[in-house]
């Protein structure tokens, strides 16, 4: 868990450009990682690979050598881990308690008159593993990196038992030196694991992180960090510039200021997300002509099939009844309604909520529209709706409300659009928008964090002037780490 925390905290950084994402990890968040921290240590310490120990036997009437092999950890109890903030730009952690048991084999050859070979076992027990580490978060190549500012390590007590051997007097010649070297090796390997290996892994991961990440169908998430985060006595906070765009396009929309208020309730973390990010996504998607959909006879399981028919009975309601020219020239056909954005859609986040505005062109074609290029008519539709965001199943999701549609005629080759038909078409458009929005919001945006640590489903989402703030605790999804 300390590994997860170091990666998570390292991703907190600051950009000199006005930020679009801000992350704050509070004392409560540090306590979460502290409480769970022993799990990753148990996993890492068990993987320690002890080197072979060799040394000469210099006492007694002869000479010889001793080799210690197959040293391995047979039992490990993690020390207690406590993380702390280290102003102005870092984080520290310390450990106390815990124990480790190590077993291995020794082989000795002692030459008096003739070589004498003997062997046995070694058992060691180390108690109270104490580590103090402070790391500073820096920036390298637009990516965060960890640097060790201060570090100390000690094992308070190490007891070694040397057993076996057919000639005790030979064993007594090297027992003190063997015990000393095993003690040093245990201290050394624990120190490397608890201090160096974890940080090297964190920096390796951080250095390998791409800053241009494809998230779906040529849509890319970009981010960059340029300055260190801010660490105080109660939280560590960093900012980054981020956007989501199509292909290799750029986004030059204005970025609005995000305040630093978090309210009075205590959470483990707070996340600020600027409306710049979804609006950049909409801008690039509109520029690439990707924001379009077709309502045809098969849309939403054929719900609008009868209305889109050019021919219908006297008691039925269809588009052919409103426009006889369709029934005359295209009998028993269907009309496709192709919707596409006429201007860049806009998402507005206010304290009162989130609203979306779309200006759509609606072109009418004989179905299928891909085979009939003549536009029968064009309408303009102004669509607005509100979004109520939520976190469901570890994804940022939501529902839409207050959908309004206003349609006006732009041009037509099939006759004038009267208000009765416009009203029917507005209802159809509203239903289509709801179907598409509900489908997209149901999928949502998955919110993974670091190594099975994610946000709680009861996270609070607050809309402010130009941004959303997510106030959340962390939860850990248990997996087997053996």
Located regions from the model:
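Eukaryotic helix-linker segments that join adjacent hydrophobic helices
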Residues: 60-70, 74-107, 112-114, 119-152
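Extended, low-charge, aliphatic-rich alpha-helical segments
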Residues: 3-4, 15-101, 156-482
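Classical eukaryotic N-terminal signal peptides for Sec-dependent ER targeting/secretion
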Residues: 1-10
């Amino acid at each position: 868990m300390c590994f997860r925390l170091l990666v998570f905290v390292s991703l907190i950084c600051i950009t000199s450009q006005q930020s679009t994402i801000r992350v704050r990890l509070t004392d409560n968040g540090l306590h979460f990682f502290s409480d769970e921290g022993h799990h990753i240590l148990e996993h890492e310490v068990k993987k320690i690979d002890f080197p072979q120990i060799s040394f000469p036997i210099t006492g007694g009437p002869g000479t010889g050598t001793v080799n210690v092999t197959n040293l391995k950890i047979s039992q490990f109890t993690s020390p207690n881990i406590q993380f702390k903030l280290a102003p102005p730009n870092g984080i520290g952690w310390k450990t106390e308690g815990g124990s480790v048991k190590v077993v291995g084999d020794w082989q000795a050859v002692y030459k008096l008159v003739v070589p004498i070979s003997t062997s046995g076992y070694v058992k060691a027990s180390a108690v109270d593993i104490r580590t103090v580490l402070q790391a500073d978060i820096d920036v390298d190549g637009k990516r965060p990196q960890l640097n060790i500012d201060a570090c100390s390590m000690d094992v308070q007590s190490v007891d070694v038992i040397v057993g076996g051997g057919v000639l005790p007097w030979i064993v007594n010649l090297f027992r003190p030196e063997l015990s000393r070297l095993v003690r040093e090796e245990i201290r050394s390997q624990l120190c490397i694991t608890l201090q160096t290996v974890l940080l090297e892994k964190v920096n390796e991961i951080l250095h390998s992180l791409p800053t241009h990440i494809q998230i779906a169908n040529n849509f890319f998430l970009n981010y960059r960090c340029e300055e260190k985060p801010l660490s105080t006595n109660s939280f560590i906070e960093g900012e980054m510039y981020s956007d989501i765009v199509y292909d290799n396009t750029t986004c030059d929309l204005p970025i609005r200021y995000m305040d630093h208020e978090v309210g009075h309730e205590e959470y483990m973390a707070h996340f600020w997300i600027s409306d710049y990010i979804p609006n950049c996504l909409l801008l690039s998607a509109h520029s690439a002509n990707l924001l379009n959909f077709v309502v045809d006879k098969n849309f939403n399981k054929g719900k609008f099939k009868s209305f889109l028919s050019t021919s219908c009975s006297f008691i039925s309601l269809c588009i052919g009844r409103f426009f006889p020219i369709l029934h005359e020239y295209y009998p028993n056909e269907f009309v496709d309604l192709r919707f596409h954005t006429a201007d860049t859609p806009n998402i507005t986040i206010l304290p009162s909520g989130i609203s979306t505005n779309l200006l759509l062109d609606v072109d009418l074609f004989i179905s299928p529209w891909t085979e009939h290029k003549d536009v029968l008519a064009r309408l303009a539709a102004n669509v607005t709706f509100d979004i109520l965001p939520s976190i469901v199943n570890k994804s940022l999701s939501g529902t839409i409300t207050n959908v309004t549609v206003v349609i006006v005629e732009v041009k037509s080759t099939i006759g004038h659009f009267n208000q009765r038909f416009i009203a029917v078409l507005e209802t159809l458009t509203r239903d289509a928008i709801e179907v598409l929005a509900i489908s997209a919001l149901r999928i949502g945006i998955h919110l993974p964090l670091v190594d099975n640590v994610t946000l709680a489903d009861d996270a609070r989402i607050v809309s402010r002037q130009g941004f959303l703030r997510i106030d959340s605790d962390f939860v850990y999804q248990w997996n087997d780490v053996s």
